[in-house]
């Protein structure tokens, strides 16, 4: 999604892609917007300048590095790209949960100061996407209303915000520190709550009818919503304890999950009466299936959890 939107909105950008599977990528990526909040913008296509598994070939000379991979892979990626980072580069990720700032400081070490690097992170991914054909096209489902960004050094956060606003054409709001992101998980509490809520009584063997599987978000039930709420309540309790001990600590982004989702998807939610209904009626959460796999590849009608 990032390649398609950045390339489409900024056609003069040169976009290089570091991938373990470079042969799977086409010369460009198309993002289809039908059914999303961005439908009136039409489809977006971004051109890829270069795709390789060689970090030196991809990263050398880059002014902005955006890491778009799961949290547990970021440390190894940072270590891989470190020798090839350019003086003054911005090095960041599209979502900061998982302690990205600590990973970056550990992996990049003295190079942050010696190369005048800026570390940054968005609080949330700019949009939810669903792959159609890997490396070729995707569906954009849920674009965010605003982006929130933190940086190290902190005094560069306004500059980073301006860069990311230019990249995504979504307003980027400065955030006072990475702890706002570490303690503001989204999928890390939404997915466990949803999966447990739906599968808690499953025997781990009996397959499901593929045609009867609910959608991951828009068919969220009361049990799943309650589990997600319990997890979020723990996050709010941690915030309360931290602020009580450190009164000057600024954690404005750590707000209840229902308020957070309504802010992220402003204008896309038709019923805000409960957490369940927020999920059910959010067009930004629509059309996302459960991660299921067929029991038999020849017969996709029976599925189990991936």
Predicted regions and their residues:
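A structural signal for isolated positions on well-ordered beta-strands in alpha/beta enzyme cores
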Residues: 14-16, 92, 118, 148
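Rossmann-like NAD(P)(H) cofactor-binding subdomain of soluble oxidoreductases
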Residues: 71-134
